[in-house]
Amino acid sequence: NSSFRFFNLDGTAASPPSSLSTLFGSDESGDPIAMYDSEADRYIITSMGSSGLNFAISQTNDPILDGWHVYNAISFGTDGQFPDYPKFSIWSDGYYCTTNTSGNDLYVLERDKIIDGDPTASIQGFNAPQMITSGFASAQVLDITNDDHPAAGNATLIYLQDDAWNQVSTDHLKIWTINIDWENPNNSSISTPYQLPTSSFTSVFDGGSFANLTQSSGPDIDAMQACIMNQAQFRKFPTHNSAVFNFVVDVLSGSDEQAAVRWYELRQDSDGEPWVIYQEGTYTAPAGRHAFGASMAMDVQGNIGMGYSSMNSTNPITLRYTGRYANDPSGQMTIEENLIGQSNATNPNTRYADYSQISVDPANDKTFWFVSEYFKPGRRDLVGTFQIAANYANDIGVVSVDTPVSGLLS
C-alpha cells in the first residue's frame, strides 16, 4: 500500500487518494496502519521508514480540513534497524510499537506531546527479555479499544511460546509489563516475563516457511504463523479489565494442515494487577476450510466479534465473521459464521493480509468494522460491518401475564 483515502460510513469517498509520501517524504517503505485514538479524538497513520517509524496524527478530529502533525522516520529512529512488520497499540502514556528486529523489538512514542504536535516528542526502545521466537517475532502490546483509559503505566506486552520452538518446553503465553518515565528515561523499564500455561497448540506450519495454505491455483499462502494478530485489544469493565487476542494454529497432525484460530480472553481485577486466562478457545471453520488472518475485539457489553479469512484447495479466499455473547459457554464462538466477501480469483503471491483489523465504532461502542484483503480479480481491500449487541439499552420482555386468565389481550 502506498496511498490513503478517507471514506464516509456509507462507502462514498470523502477525499481523493493521497500518496503516503505526501505525508512522510521520500523515506517511506510501506506497511501503513490507520488507527483512531478515541480518547484524544484523533486519527493516526503510520508507516515504515528505512530505519525509523513514520507517524502522523490529525491536528483535530477532521484531518481533511485541518491537516496533520507529522513525525518522519528521522524523528522516531529505530536504532539503525529497518522496523520490520510494525504493530501499533494505543496506551494511556504512549503509542507502543513492536517490530521484528534484533536488539530492541519494542518502541514507545511520547503520546501527550505527539497529540499537541510538539516537535520534541521522543521515542524509547526496549528489548523484551526472555522472548523466544521461531526466527520471526510479532508480539503485541494491548491496545485500548475505546476512550476509557486505565491509569498511565503498566502497559502489557503479550507473546505466544510454542513447545515446537527451540528452548520452549511447554506451550504458554508470556506477559511483560512496561513502565515509561518521559522525564527521566533511565527510570523506564520492561519487566521480566511471567508465564500463563495454556492448552496445547501447534503454531508451526511447514517448518516455519512463508508458503503454507494451498489454493486451487497459484502459490501456497502464508498462514502468518508465530504472530499475535492485529490487534490485541484491552477494555475496562466495572468489575475487571479484559484483553482479547488470537494467533493461527494447525489443528491437524502429520503432513496434513488446517489453519484455525486460537483465541484468548485474559482478565485482571484492576489496573496493574496480574493477568489470568479467563477463557481460551480454538475456532475451526466449517467444511474443513482454513480460518486465519483473524482480528477480534469486545464491544461495550463484553460480546466478542471476530473477522477472519477462510479458504481451502478448491475455494478461493472469503472474508467471514463469527462471535459470541458475553454470557455464552466459555471458549466457544457461538455465533454461526457469516460471509462478508467472496473472492473470484486466487492470490498470486504467498503474502496476504498482514494487517487485517477489526475496530469498534466509537459512536455506539457496539458495531464492529473489519477490513482485510480479497481478490476480485486483483488484490483489493474490503470493509465489512456487523453488530452482535442489541440497539436498545435495556432488554425488556414479558415476565408473566396475571390477568386476564383467558381471553384476548388488548
Predicted stretch roles:
Residues 390-410:
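Extracellular/luminal regions of secreted and cell-surface proteins that mediate adhesion/ECM remodeling
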Residues 1-391:
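C-terminal PAP-associated
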